[in-house]
Amino acid sequence: MVDRALKSADIVGRVPSILGIRPGQTDEEGWAAIDEFVADTDDGRKRRKALEDCIDENAYHFHAHGVELGHRYTSTAVVGDGTPFPAHTRDPELYYQPTTHPGAYLPHVWIERNGEQISTLDAVGHGRFTVITGIGGEAWVAAAEKIGAEVGVEIASAPIGYRLAFDDVYGDWARAREISDGGCLLVRPDRHIAWRSHGMADDPLSALREAIDAVLSRV
C-alpha cells in the first residue's frame, strides 16, 4: 500500500514539469510554457506524448481497485485452510480479484434480505463475527450460537442461498463463495475472512470452536 502510494505520487508529480510549469515562474512564463506545449514543434509533440503516457499511468493512481480491495495477508487472527491464495489473472494493483480464501476481504455480491437488495458486505461486520453458510448449513449456525455464548463473543449467522434468510436471488454468491452449500466462512468484524470450511465438517462444533480459539488466541 505504501509503495503504491509513493509510486502514484511520483506519477502525479510529473505533470507540472511535462507542462513546463515550475516554481517561481511569472504568469507570462507559465502561459508561454503552455503555448509551447500545444505548439506544432518537436518539443511540443514530445511533451504531449509524455503527458498521454503519464495519464495512462495514472490509472494506478485513480483506478487501483486491486490495491483498495484486494488485501491478502496472514496473521494469528487468520486460520489458513492449507491452500495457497489464488494466482492473480490480471494486474493485481489495478484489478480486484475476489476470493474467500482466509485472509482476504469478503467479496461483494448483491443478495436480498426481506425483499430488499443488500450487499454481502452488509450481512457481516457491525462489530461482530459472522458465520456464513448455505442450504444445509444449520449445524454451523447452531455451533456459532453455542460457541458465542461460551466465549462471550457475539457470532452472528448469515445463511446465504436460495430462499434463505439472505436470498441469493441470482446465484451470484454461489459462483463467488468457493465453498459448497454446507461449507462455512467465519468473517471477522472487519469483514476479512478468518477461516473457512469447504464443506460440512464431521464435527462442525469442534471445527468452528478450534477456529475461533485460534483467531482469538485462546489456544
Segment roles from a protein language model:
Residues 1-219:
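Helical substrate-recognition/capping region of FAD-dependent monooxygenase/halogenase enzymes
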